[in-house]
Amino acid sequence: TWRIEAGGPVETPHLVNCAGAWSDRVARLAGLEPKVRIVPFRGEYHLLAPEAAGLVRGLIYPVPDPRFPFLGVHLTRMVTGEVEAGPNAVLALSRRGYRWTDVSLRDLASTLSYPGAWRLFARHAATGLGEVHRSLSRRAFARALRRLVPALRDEHLRPAGSGVRAQALGPDGKLLDDFAFERAPGALHVLCAPSPAATASLAIGEEIARVALEPLG
């Protein structure tokens, strides 16, 4: 029986951990030592200025890089008529790192103390520095978008929101792009759920439920 105290005591014979950016820590609280580590990546967005929105009438994506589970900056026309540009994928300094000023020493230490993170940095240093440049420079962000829509100009970009991706990283420095489960008696820990989680949320939920119910027959 699992007892959870947050927000009041809850007891249950079966637990499914889908804690996202904190899933590895919840697994440790349950007595496991997960092989993967959650490393936060921030995805930053811009909106196109109204005078440039007419350049995009649908979805425009770059050819994906098979080395990464990220799609690259792309353009999406929303139901409101606005056009969203992004996201990039820059290492966040906190698991709540929606801005550069959001810094958690605990989260940063968790990333930097993990050997898999250093293997990732060594393997893809140039790509990582490019993402940082696009995060800090509107001109660099716009340059990436001009590969898709050459008529876009720097001044067409308006800063918008951001999100944090709970990216599971293996000890070999590889970014996971498929489900990663770990079990404990009476518990299933979901350490990685593939993107696009919102678009495929019902199917992902069905798969997690199927795996969670397997031991029950």
Regions found by a protein language model. Name each.
Residues W100-R106, T111-G217:
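C-terminal catalytic lobe of FAD-dependent flavoproteins
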Residues W2-V103:
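Flavin-dependent oxidoreductases
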Residues T1, N17, S113-A117:
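Short hydrophobic/aromatic-rich motifs at helix boundaries and adjacent loops
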